[in-house]
Curated annotation (Swiss-Prot):
<protein>
    <recommendedName>
        <fullName>Sulfur carrier protein TusA</fullName>
    </recommendedName>
</protein>
<comment type="similarity">
    <text>Belongs to the sulfur carrier protein TusA family.</text>
</comment>
<dbReference type="GO" id="GO:0097163">
    <property type="term" value="F:sulfur carrier activity"/>
</dbReference>
<comment type="pathway">
    <text>tRNA modification.</text>
</comment>
<comment type="subunit">
    <text>Interacts with IscS.</text>
</comment>
<feature type="active site" description="Cysteine persulfide intermediate">
    <location>
        <position position="19"/>
    </location>
</feature>
<dbReference type="InterPro" id="IPR036868">
    <property type="entry name" value="TusA-like_sf"/>
</dbReference>
<dbReference type="InterPro" id="IPR022931">
    <property type="entry name" value="Sulphur_carrier_TusA"/>
</dbReference>
<keyword id="KW-0963">Cytoplasm</keyword>
<dbReference type="Pfam" id="PF01206">
    <property type="entry name" value="TusA"/>
</dbReference>
<comment type="function">
    <text>Sulfur carrier protein involved in sulfur trafficking in the cell. Part of a sulfur-relay system required for 2-thiolation during synthesis of 2-thiouridine of the modified wobble base 5-methylaminomethyl-2-thiouridine (mnm(5)s(2)U) in tRNA. Interacts with IscS and stimulates its cysteine desulfurase activity. Accepts an activated sulfur from IscS, which is then transferred to TusD, and thus determines the direction of sulfur flow from IscS to 2-thiouridine formation. Also appears to be involved in sulfur transfer for the biosynthesis of molybdopterin.</text>
</comment>
<keyword id="KW-0819">tRNA processing</keyword>
<dbReference type="GO" id="GO:0005737">
    <property type="term" value="C:cytoplasm"/>
</dbReference>
<dbReference type="InterPro" id="IPR001455">
    <property type="entry name" value="TusA-like"/>
</dbReference>
<dbReference type="GO" id="GO:0002143">
    <property type="term" value="P:tRNA wobble position uridine thiolation"/>
</dbReference>
Amino acid sequence: MTDLFSSPDHTLDALGLRCPEPVMMVRKTVRNMQPGETLLIIADDPATTRDIPGFCTFMEHELVAKETDGLPYRYLIRKGH
């Protein structure tokens, strides 16, 4: 099985940051990416389990994978159009 988290185009370390900082940093990072590129987000704020999927839905990006069973949380998103 391939580890989806192993080769992202970009990585964002949001460890230690609290809402709303992680999603604000994700938005800023994604804005500078090209459509189709991937971003690995590493976070430990429980609010990201709600905020990151919500951000992807609202902004029409794909949540490719998430790992939220333990800390740190990991999310892989693919930029939409």
